[in-house]
A protein has these predicted regions:
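Glycine-rich, proline-tolerant flexible connector loops at the mouths of alpha/beta enzymes
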Residues: 27-36, 65-70, 89-110
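N-terminal amphipathic alpha-helix/helix-capping segment at the start of soluble metabolic enzymes
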Residues: 1-61, 66
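Short, acidic/polar
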Residues: 71-84, 124-131, 172-178
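Active-site-adjacent beta->alpha loops and helix N-cap segments on the catalytic face
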Residues: 96-114, 122-131, 143-160, 175-179
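Conserved beta-strand positions in the central sheet of alpha/beta enzyme cores
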Residues: 91-92, 142, 168
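Active-site mouth loops of central-metabolism enzymes
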Residues: 57-75, 117-125, 166-171
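Conserved, mostly hydrophobic/aromatic
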Residues: 8, 58, 83, 91, ...
Length: 182
């Protein structure tokens, strides 16, 4: 892992342990059971492929470690509306709080206003996070192979599928791509 990714993962481990002290898995499962706003991310893309249309996944993020703050007056709903008005296929919402200044709440806010599938873009290292993302309305997750080992990636992938979520796997090297395709 590179230096910034190491920092993000270490912070993410701390954050997850803190959240688990206050939020039970059963509470998340109850919230998921009551939510009917889930949309099929993968199906939306496949429908475009079948109809020979391009699929655009539009990213919503406030900041990044490399770029700093991108939007001073960041309004995820306003950005999502602009993308929706321009007929994007799906949305990718960056939810990592410390380095990208995101929030899972942004997914919930967007899903209440816009009927597009939403990918939760975060640093997934624990299945608990998948339940969190789903409880806020995420339809898909991103697994970044550079941040976790292959066994954990497979566990996260299977957990997301159990929750009827789509999964996008991000690789940064040829070796990671080969592992992802196993």
């Amino acid at each position: 892992m590179n230096n910034i990714l190491d920092k993000i993962i270490r912070k993410k481990i701390e954050k997850i342990e803190e959240v688990k002290k206050n939020v039970s898995l059963d509470l998340l499962k109850d919230k998921i059971a009551k939510n009917d706003s889930f949309l099929n991310f993968k199906e939306k893309i496949f429908n475009n492929v079948k109809n020979n249309k391009i699929s655009i996944i539009a990213e919503i993020k406030k900041a990044s470690p490399s770029a700093g703050i991108i939007f001073n007056d960041y309004d995820p709903i306003k950005i999502a509306n602009i993308y929706n008005d321009n007929k994007v296929t799906c949305l990718s919402v960056l939810t990592e709080e410390d380095f990208f200044l995101g929030s899972l709440k942004h997914i919930d806010q967007i899903k209440k206003k816009i009927k597009l599938p939403v990918l939760c873009k975060d640093f997934f290292i624990d299945p608990f996070q998948i339940y969190q993302a789903k409880s806020y309305g995420a339809d898909a997750i991103l697994i970044i192979l550079a941040g976790i080992n292959n066994d954990n990636a497979q566990k996260l992938y299977n957990e997301a599928l159990k929750l009827n979520m789509s999964v996008i796997v991000e690789v940064h090297t040829v070796e990671e791509a080969k592992e992802a395709l196993k």
